[in-house]
């Protein structure tokens, strides 16, 4: 099979020919470079109009020259309009800049009609994921997409790519560009930040993680202020990378923990950054997870990934009629019907428990519901031990939770975060309990070693026992916390324990607040974890709202809609 791919969502006018016979991809690209500032949509669209015919022509010339090497192609007749052996035309249908997408759509329709072959509409962000899966050979990885206008975590479950976490304001590349424009550097800003960061030292900047979501607006404002106040640009660039990429690596680890998978791929143009790659690789090594990064030519915007995914969709019968091929600037990856993966393994596999082997100290995996052994989450190792094994005389089974130092993070930043979160967990766990929410008793806290001893509660994580009754109760509990001015910060299905009661645990990201926005964000984090991993999330999402409104302020539910609309391309 041979596929002509066409890309042009923002800045790269690109065409490619993918031949599945030898798994070869030929790419021709012509990037748009603004004279000043960032990308100007009208100018970018004009560039697409001028550059796309040339890159398409170059790719078709290559296809014609190599058509004899292709097998099972549409035709090898040199007198045919399709003397290039092309079986279909795949194009970026969205998301992206509307003027650019419309130009690409027009070019793709014209090419499909001229070649007399079917048309395939491809989601640009899913293509970033699929090229990573294609090159790595992974079965069902989590994908961290870090690109100009986007930053999110995706995983496959029941016929869709679910959004596990995402930016709540701007894409990571655009965030870096905003800073570099502020100090007078030309587009693109990311490579310039990376170069300057080699000589920098750490300064304090905001670090914002909420569940598996994150925000860049605060850190960008702080970075601009630091530049205006005369802070060394090298130090700001270094600190931007340490904080932003630390946030992305942390949420990627949280996604691995939530789903139980042990495979991670990186996508998007910002993924070319060596520091980000190093952080993710270190994190995966510490977890025993596999990590893969596609070739650089597949990380930046390119038509090769469009052609590769187009081939999968074409083989699955996912073509689109010319009349139905309208582009969509807000095309979310979780809207795509993933027919080419029907019946394949879900990313949600359940979290295992490590147990020491008496023979050699190696680890084996038990079911997540087993209450004995050592369980590793995103931040900590948790040992469930008998009272006699504790350093203190305790009345019941004990949980020893030790927050691990993260080698991927800057040591100073890591020390600050682990200490603050250990203290916050101890304080908020007790305060939530005082507000009437079932939480473990805290028996001891040691900030220096980042270790807590807590009461063991429940029989399993909510993730293993999802029911509407349990989720309704979680809604009740969050409302009770909010009524007391407390925010959980990370109420995912892994941070709720169920048994004779429903318990909230792991308050490390918690804080005090009287703001309705923070309460709505708590609900969003819970709902997102349900939507990402449940087979039938709709009744569970309703249960969250029902449980919350029975106890809490209905204005929080109203604000929730606003919060969820902030996700990219909602």
PLM region descriptions:
Residues 507-570:
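C-lobe/activation-segment region of protein kinase-like
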Residues 117-142:
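Conserved phosphate-binding catalytic cores of ATP/NTP-utilizing and phosphoryl-transfer enzymes
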Residues 2-95, 102:
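N-terminal beta-alpha supersecondary unit
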Residues 24, 68-81, 195-264, 275-285, ...:
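A contiguous, well-structured pocket-lining segment that forms one wall/lid of small-molecule binding clefts
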Residues 5-8, 144-146, 153-231, 317-329, ...:
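A short helix-loop
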Residues 122, 281-306, 319-323:
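Conserved phosphate-binding/catalytic loops in two-lobed NTP-binding clefts
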Residues 369-423:
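ATP-binding glycine-rich loop module of kinase domains
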Residues 418-422, 437-474:
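Conserved structural core of kinase catalytic domains
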């Amino acid at each position: 099979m041979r596929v002509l791919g066409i890309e042009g969502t923002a800045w790269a006018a690109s065409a490619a020919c993918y031949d599945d016979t030898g798994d070869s991809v030929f790419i021709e690209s012509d990037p748009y470079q603004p004279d000043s500032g960032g990308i100007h949509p009208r100018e970018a669209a004009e560039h697409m109009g001028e550059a796309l015919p040339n890159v398409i022509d170059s790719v078709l010339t290559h296809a014609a020259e190599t058509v004899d090497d292709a097998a099972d192609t549409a035709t090898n007749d040199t007198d045919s309009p399709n003397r290039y052996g092309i079986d279909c035309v795949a194009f970026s249908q969205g998301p992206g800049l509307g003027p650019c997408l419309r130009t690409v759509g027009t070019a793709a329709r014209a090419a499909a009609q001229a070649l007399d072959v079917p048309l395939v509409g491809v989601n640009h962000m899913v293509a970033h994921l699929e090229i990573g899966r294609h090159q790595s050979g992974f079965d069902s990885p989590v994908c961290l997409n870090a690109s100009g206008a986007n930053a999110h975590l995706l995983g496959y479950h029941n016929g869709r790519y679910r959004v596990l976490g995402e930016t709540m304001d701007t894409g990571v590349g655009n965030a870096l560009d905003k800073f570099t424009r502020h100090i007078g550097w030309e587009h693109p800003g990311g490579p310039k930040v990376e170069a300057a960061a080699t000589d920098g030292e750490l300064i304090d900047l905001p670090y914002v993680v909420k569940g598996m979501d994150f925000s860049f607006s605060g850190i960008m404002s702080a970075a601009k202020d630091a530049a205006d106040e005369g802070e060394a640009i090298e130090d700001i660039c270094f600190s931007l990378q340490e904080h932003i990429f630390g946030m992305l690596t942390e949420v990627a680890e949280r996604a691995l923990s939530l789903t139980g998978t042990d495979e991670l791929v990186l996508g998007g143009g910002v993924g070319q950054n060596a520091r980000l790659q190093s952080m993710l690789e270190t994190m995966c090594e510490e977890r025993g997870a596999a990590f893969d990064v596609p070739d650089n030519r597949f990380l930046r915007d390119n038509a090769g990934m469009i052609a590769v995914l187009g081939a999968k969709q074409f083989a699955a019968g996912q073509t689109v009629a010319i009349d139905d091929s309208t582009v969509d600037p807000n095309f979310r990856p979780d809207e795509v019907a993933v027919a080419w993966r029907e019946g394949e393994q879900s990313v949600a596999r359940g979290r295992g428990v490590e147990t020491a082997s008496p023979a050699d100290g190696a680890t084996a995996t038990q079911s997540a519901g087993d209450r004995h052994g050592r369980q590793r989450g995103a931040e900590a190792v948790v040992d469930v031990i008998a009272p006699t094994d504790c350093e203190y005389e305790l009345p019941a089974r004990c949980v020893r939770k030790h927050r691990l130092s993260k080698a991927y993070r800057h040591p100073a930043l890591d020390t600050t975060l682990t200490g603050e979160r250990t203290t916050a967990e101890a304080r908020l766990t007790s305060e939530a309990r005082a507000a009437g929410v079932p939480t473990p008793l805290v028996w001891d806290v040691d900030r220096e070693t980042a270790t807590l001893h807590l009461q063991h509660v429940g029989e399993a994580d909510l993730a293993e026992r999802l029911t509407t009754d349990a989720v309704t109760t979680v809604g009740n509990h969050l409302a009770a916390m909010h009524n007391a001015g407390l925010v959980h910060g990370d109420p995912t299905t892994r941070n709720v324990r169920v048994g004779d009661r429903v318990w909230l645990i792991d308050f490390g990201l918690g804080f005090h607040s009287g703001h309705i926005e923070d309460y709505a964000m708590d609900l969003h984090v819970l709902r997102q974890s349900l939507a990402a991993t449940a087979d039938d999330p709709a009744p569970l999402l309703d249960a969250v709202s029902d449980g919350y409104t029975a106890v809490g302020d209905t204005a929080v539910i109203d604000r929730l809609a606003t919060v969820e609309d902030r996700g990219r391309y909602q």
